Amino acid sequence: MKKSEIFASVLADVSAETEIDSDRILSSERKEEVVDARYLVIFLLLGNGFYPAMIAERMGLSARAVRSAISGFEARLANSAGLRLVCQRLAAKWMA
């Protein structure tokens, strides 16, 4: 699968699983559930061989924002049972 196809599929899967529109995930919206979904997309893309700069380019973020999301993902995961459940389901598909 091409990188562009992986990106689109991961984004669509996270959007479907979280019931948050992909446009909102890619926006600068700061609501907790949207930020969690954005971080999850970044985590899954990283696990599929994307570099932070590649993720940043595709998501319209700075590389620094992506690195911050990567370093803060475990803390968000530890504090959100809902995010953990969604992450487990999607990681089984995308990280296998």
Residue ranges: model-predicted function:
Residues 54-58:
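Short alpha-helical "recognition helix" segments of helix-turn-helix
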Residues 76-96:
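Short Lys/Arg-enriched helix C-cap and helix-to-coil transition segments
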Residues 16-38:
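Short, Lys/Arg-enriched anionic-surface-contact patches
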Residues 12, 53:
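Residues within the helices of the helix-turn-helix
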